[in-house]
A protein has these predicted regions:
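Internal helix-turn-beta structural module
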Residues: 280, 284-308, 314-382
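Glycine-rich beta-strand-to-loop/alpha-helix junction loops that act as flexible
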Residues: 71-74, 190-193, 304, 308-316
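Short beta-strand-loop/turn "lid" adjacent to the catalytic site in phosphate-handling enzymes
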Residues: 52-104, 125, 131-140
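Adenine-nucleotide phosphate-binding core of ATP-dependent small-molecule kinases
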Residues: 247, 254-258, 265-300
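Glycine-rich phosphate-binding loop of actin/hexokinase-like ATP-binding domains
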Residues: 132-237
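Short glycine-rich, Thr/Ser-proximal phosphate-binding strand/loop in the N-terminal lobe
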Residues: 1-39, 210
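Catalytic phosphate/nucleotide-handling subdomain of diverse soluble enzymes
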Residues: 200, 205-241, 247, 311-342
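Phosphate/pyrophosphate-binding loops at sites that engage ATP/ADP/AMP, CoA/4′-phosphopantetheine
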Residues: 51-66, 172-179, 294-305
Length: 382
């Protein structure tokens, strides 16, 4: 982009439920919170636009200064392998993908519809979480289920956090001044939700999340990898239906379910230091699962050149990065503990000069990717 300055940032929380608020950083860099009941997305976007044009808090004078709008859309299925300009056909395909992401795509659509109503005629672009992973080979994305289920319902691995994995992998190569298309990269986006991706020669070749964001790593409230037979066993024992099982594995499991303390890794770390035995188990499981995926993806790619940590935990929790890299010298990972212990939330190489694998922290910036893709697509339409 010609100009890459951030002129406004913020987000709406708790839309449609009590306690909704808009958090933003004003033009002076001060954090501001506006408490206001927000019934739906249209009302929320109207509030955002009123703030953007506010004389004191805003950065533009009128809505017509907005050239385009970029949207994050969680699931594009096999229909989208890149970001696209939104039209009626694209909207129809996003609607078709709602059954694959019933918790996310409908909300994404609400934002698009609201913006179309408030800013009619303004170009809008959809940037899909799943698009980056559409380069996976079939043997990586297929499940060992009857092939007809893939043909009828699209049951396969799709992966998520693609916008983040794309950004941090490219940014790491820019920092290291190495060609993106010639690297074997493992990106670890770890936080309350988390996923790991193997990127070989500039393409995603495998990723830990699956048909849904539940598969893979142990997360804040999601169980991650689990024997499917466990679910039918629990359904029979507890008398649970499909909706209750979905709630169990999405909202009641993960480090929260194991520890009984919190889904927040910062609070879990405090509990570990206090000697809470269940918190210790949860923390150990969290790191162990990440380590296993790093080893698996190194095997899948025949080695690894760069390991990237990002996400809330990856960027800030030094102890977790240490735990993941411990005893990984056999594949060429040598952590510089003195540097690692001081790095939080900023770009930095945290491996030793002798390390065959470069380990680097790269704060993610999905909003930049959305803005960049929107600019690129808008430019192509002119």
């Amino acid at each position: 982009m010609e100009s890459e300055a951030v002129i406004a940032q913020g987000g709406l929380e708790r839309i449609g439920i009590p306690g909704s608020r808009l958090k933003l950083v004003d033009s002076k860099g001060e954090k501001v919170t506006i408490e206001k009941d927000i019934a739906g997305h249209e009302e929320g976007i109207s509030l955002i636009l009123s703030v953007l044009t506010d004389e004191k808090l805003g950065c533009i004078k009128a809505y017509n200064e907005i050239d385009a709008v970029g949207h994050r859309v969680v699931h594009g299925g096999e229909k989208f392998a890149s970001s696209v300009l939104i039209d009626d056909e694209v909207l129809a395909k996003i609607v078709e993908c709602c059954e694959l992401a019933p918790l996310h795509n409908p909300a994404n659509l609400e934002g698009i519809y609201a913006m179309q109503k408030i800013l009619p005629g303004t170009p809008q672009v959809a940037v899909f979480d799943t698009a980056f992973h559409q380069t996976m080979p079939d043997y990586a994305y297929m499940y060992g289920l009857p092939y007809e289920l893939y043909q009828k319902y699209g049951v396969r691995r799709y992966g998520f956090h693609g916008t983040s994995h794309r950004y941090v992998s490219r940014r790491a190569c820019e920092i290291l001044n190495v060609p993106y298309e010639k690297q074997r990269i493992i990106t670890a986006h770890i936080g309350n939700g988390g996923s790991i991706t193997a990127i070989q020669n500039g393409k995603s070749v495998d990723t830990s999340m699956g048909l849904t964001p539940v598969e893979g790593l142990l997360m804040g409230t999601r169980c991650g990898d689990i024997d499917p037979g466990v679910l039918t066993f629990i359904m029979n024992k507890e008398g649970l239906n499909a909706d209750k099982v979905s709630n169990l594995i999405n909202k009641d499991s993960g480090v929260l379910g194991i520890s009984g303390v919190s889904s927040d890794m910062r609070e879990l770390e405090i509990a570990v230091k206090e000697g809470n035995p269940r918190a210790i188990i949860a923390m150990s499981m969290y790191g162990y699962r990440i380590k296993k995926y790093v080893g698996a993806y190194a095997a899948a790619m025949g080695g690894v050149d760069i390991l990237v940590f990002t996400g809330g935990v990856g960027e800030n929790q030094t102890s977790m990065r240490k735990a993941v890299c411990q005893n990984m010298e056999y594949i060429g990972i040598h952590l510089d503990h003195a540097i690692n212990d001081t790095i939080q939330g900023k770009e930095m190489v945290i491996s030793t000069p002798e390390s065959k694998v470069t380990v680097i922290v790269v704060p993610t910036d999905e909003e930049y990717v959305i803005a960049s893709d929107t600019q690129d697509i808008l430019g192509n339409q002119v």
